[in-house]
A protein has these predicted regions:
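Extracytoplasmic/lumenal domain signature
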Residues: 1-20, 25-37, 41-103, 108-174, ...
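S-adenosyl-L-methionine-dependent nucleic acid methyltransferase catalytic domains
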Residues: 59, 271-272
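Small side chains
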Residues: 155, 195, 262-265, 274
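Short, aromatic- and cysteine-enriched interfacial helices/patches
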Residues: 240, 258-259, 284
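Juxtamembrane/start-of-transmembrane alpha-helix segments at the extracytoplasmic/lumenal side
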Residues: 253-269
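C-terminal membrane-anchoring or membrane-association module
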Residues: 273-286
Length: 286
């Protein structure tokens, strides 16, 4: 019919810019032993929402994750939100998560676990001149604070709404999350590639790719039908796409797709890619 069935507003009268970003997932999940179709979303304000897809009702209370929340207004307030607030209340104030999140990238879901990434990143809100229709007018500006910036990845048990584990990352994280066969794949803005155990968060592999990671790792087959892990990095440096080979799984062993042991062995190829990349950069700069 084209008519709205339901809606759920995460942050009424949002003055911090903490909307859900690219993170909405529709999937079947097990809740209290019963399979149910759910909607999962995370916001730039570092809250995760798990909703009944049929009704829009919350299955769990909003799940808070990430670093501390400072000068944040109207998150999870519903009809109790202060609709008279203006952005004047945060002028000359530092607020966290900042204007860019928080959780601002694509999340992932597998084996009843929701994986979300959060940037521990604050911004300051000030008044100033901004360009509007080729003219300078009075407006608001966002400034980056001088504090160290880091990130964290969180695994949330969808059946309970509890955080299973948290993995800290030393730099900002703007790429999406990929999960396959019990392995979580990440690449941060400093170019570090990670493979984590999806159940425990244990690091299976960490490889420097020497370029900013701003996109999710992709798993697909090449023209020959061989499975590959594709890692894109670049930023201000020359960009590359590294194609990493996956191991052939012996059918006599457990049939879990990409085995962790095989993963660790196969990703040795990445070291070769990294060395060749460094040689290329040195040659290019000279």
């Amino acid at each position: 019919t084209g008519k709205m069935i339901w809606y759920y507003q995460t942050t009424p009268h949002d003055i911090n810019g903490h909307e859900p970003a690219r993170s909405i997932i529709l999937a079947n999940a097990t809740i209290d032993g019963v399979e149910k179709k759910v909607i999962m979303a995370s916001t730039k304000g570092d809250y995760a929402y798990i909703l009944d897809a049929a009704t829009g009702e919350l299955i769990h209370e909003p799940i808070s994750f990430g670093a501390q929340k400072i000068n944040i207004y109207n998150s999870n307030k519903g009809n109790d939100a202060d609709f008279l607030l203006s952005q004047e209340v945060i002028v000359d104030q530092t607020y966290c998560p900042g204007a860019f999140g928080g959780s601002s990238t694509t999340s992932a879901f597998a084996d009843n676990i929701l994986f979300v990434a959060s940037q521990n990143y604050c911004t300051k809100f000030t008044k100033g001149q901004v360009i509007y229709k080729d003219q300078l007018i009075d407006g608001y500006q966002i400034e980056t604070t001088q504090e160290a910036q880091s990130s964290s990845v969180h695994a949330i048990d969808v059946s309970t709404g509890q955080i299973k584990w948290t993995f800290p990352i030393e730099s900002r994280y703007q790429g999406g999350i990929t999960v396959s066969s019990g392995v979580v794949y990440l690449v941060d803005i400093s170019g570090n590639f990670y493979a984590l155990d999806s159940e425990t968060g244990e690091v299976l592999k960490k490889i420097p790719m020497n370029g900013a990671g701003n996109a999710a790792v992709t798993i697909a087959s090449d023209a020959n039908g061989d499975m590959r892990i594709f890692v894109a990095t670049g930023g201000s440096k020359s960009g590359i796409i590294a194609a990493l080979g996956l191991p052939v799984v012996d059918s006599s062993e457990d049939d879990e797709g990409i085995s962790r042991r095989g993963l660790i062995g196969s990703l040795v190829l990445t070291s070769i890619v990294g060395i060749l990349y460094l040689l290329f950069i040195r040659y290019y700069r000279n």
